[in-house]
Curated annotation (Swiss-Prot):
SUPFAM superfamilies membership: Intermediate filament protein, coiled coil region, Lamin A/C globular tail domain
Name of the molecule in the record: Muscle cell intermediate filament protein AV71
Keywords from the named record: Coiled coil, Intermediate filament
One Pfam family of this chain: Filament
The UniProt record lists the keyword Coiled coil: yes
Sequence segments annotated as region (Coil 1B): 1-73
Annotated spans, Coil 2: 92-239
Gene: AV71
Region spans: Tail: 240-394
Length: 394
């Protein structure tokens, strides 16, 4: 802001110098005009002097003519012998001569007075104008000198301010570089933190899955124990042998976390009965399909053979109505003894080849009768996972 103010002042001073130069040029032109007028008046004075000389010569000539006429008249009067006539003509001639001389003297005096007055007036006007122009020119020179000094000071100050501005700009640039470095460091730290968080979440998810598998195993074992106990007690018929692979999960109506108990159900509780049936025609099987629709887990059970399952399709049908289809990426290979989890959109992290994400759906669907079937590229069924659930209230 201070630099802009100084620049504006410099511009104003330069405009003032330009204006004063214009005024000085105008005054110089006026002085030259006055000098030209003086020269013209001098020429006029010389012309008038010449005219005066001509008039004086004419007067002298007329005087000589008149003198000659007077001489002739005197001669004529001298020839007149009458004293009265001579005296009369002499008196008349003297009177005429006086009148003529008085008239010419008056004319000469008037012309001389007029010429002297006119020339004095013109000379005084020229002197006054010249003095005024000299004063104005002197003032303009002093003003130009003062403005030059002020302009020099402002230029020096402007140079100092520009130096300071350059230094500040350099410091600003260095600070910007430092800020960019700090931002990159901060982003790198954030990325590291996010990577650690993702890793911890994945580990937590793996632990949760392992815990869920243990709970499922425990529930299955508890159910089998309960079935055997009932069979031993005679409370179940022999058809119960088909339920060895069934999972019995009892859930209180006010509790979100499932609890595993025996098949006995108390009054006022909700019992949920879920059975799973899995089959596979080869090494690739559907190991698990989340009942909440979050993921589907496929596994290569062979310990040494890779299974190329690129473009294979997982078809999931919910309650015989809605159908969801997921296609594996082209050239996807499932390693021996490895599994791949396909997450619904927003439910897990994309980390191939162990974890994939189905971007088309945010859930694989929830229902009481859910069939998940794996087809190869030729449309042949290679594996299936069937889930059936029933709920009773006592």
């Amino acid at each position: 802001a201070e630099i802009n103010l100084v620049r504006r002042r410099v511009n104003n001073l330069e405009e003032e110098v330009t204006r004063i130069k214009k005024d000085n040029l105008y005054l110089v032109n006026e002085l030259n005009k006055a000098r030209s007028d003086l020269d013209q008046e001098t020429l006029n004075r010389i012309d008038f002097q010449n005219q005066l000389q001509t008039l004086l010569e004419e007067i002298d000539f007329m005087r000589r003519v008149h003198d000659q006429e007077i001489t002739e008249l005197q001669a004529m009067a001298a020839r007149d012998t009458t004293p009265e006539n001579r005296e009369y003509f002499k008196n008349e001639l003297s009177s005429a001569i006086r009148d003529i001389r008085a008239e010419y003297d008056q004319i000469c005096n008037i012309n001389r007075t007029d010429m002297e007055s006119w020339y004095k007036l013109k000379v005084q006007e020229i002197q006054t104008q010249s003095t005024r122009q000299n004063l104005e020119q002197g003032y303009a020179k002093e003003e130009v000198k003062r403005l030059r000094v002020q302009l020099s000071e402002l230029r020096g100050k402007l140079a100092d301010l520009e130096g300071r501005n350059s230094l500040l700009e350099k410091q600003t640039q260095e600070l910007n570089y430092q800020l960019e470095d700090d931002q990159r460091s901060y982003e790198a730290a954030l990325n590291d933190r996010d990577a650690q968080i993702r890793k911890m979440r994945e580990e937590c998810q793996a632990l949760m899955m392992e815990l869920q598998m243990l709970l499922d195993t425990k529930q299955t074992l508890d159910a089998e124990i309960a079935i055997y106990r009932k069979m031993l007690e005679g409370e179940e018929n022999r058809a119960g042998l088909r339920q060895l692979v069934e999972q019995v999960v009892k859930t209180h109506s006010l509790t979100e976390i499932g609890e595993t108990e025996s098949i006995r159900v108390l009054k006022g509780e909700t019992a949920s009965r879920t059975s799973f049936q899995r089959s596979a025609k080869g090494n690739v099987s559907i190991q698990d399909a989340a009942s909440d629709g979050k993921y589907i887990l496929s596994e290569n059970t062979h310990r040494s053979k890779e299974e190329p399952i690129g473009e294979w399709r997982l078809k999931r049908k919910i309650d015989g109505k809605r159908e969801i289809v997921y296609t594996f990426p082209t050239n996807f290979v499932l390693k021996p003894g490895k599994s791949v989890k396909i997450w619904a959109r927003g439910q897990g992290v994309y980390s191939p080849p162990d974890q994939l994400v189905f971007d088309a759906e945010d859930s694989f669907g929830i229902g009481s009768n859910v069939q998940t079937i794996l087809f190869n590229k030729e449309g042949e069924e290679r594996a299936s996972h069937i889930q059936r659930s029933s709920h009773t209230i006592n």
